[in-house]
Amino acid sequence: VPYRGNFTRGIFTSIYMKFDHEIEDTKSIYKDFYENHPFTFLSKNDINLKEVINTNKCHVKIEFHESIIHITTVLDNLLKGASGQAVQNLNIIYGYEESLGLNFKGSIY
């Protein structure tokens, strides 16, 4: 579910689903999967759009409520969106470091 709020840029999403797997196993799977992804970060704390604005980062938080898993994400759709993805893909295609030109926080916003 994408959320619309009082913000000019960024995307906040939320996923809820029934879940009957082990909590620690699930957290471990997510941690292992994103370990080598330079722009995706798992957070134990509440996530906020301000943390990702003007960056190519995506923050993910996983919570469990009885038999429900709740995954929330935040990203800046103007950088992590199409433009940042294009730069990241070109870096991979041409053999450059995946994060080349993307590890900065813009000074304007």
Predicted regions and their residues:
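NAD(P)-dependent Rossmann-like dehydrogenase/reductase catalytic/cofactor-binding core
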Residues: 59-109
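C-terminal substrate-binding/catalytic lobe of Rossmann-fold NAD(P)-dependent oxidoreductases
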Residues: 1-75
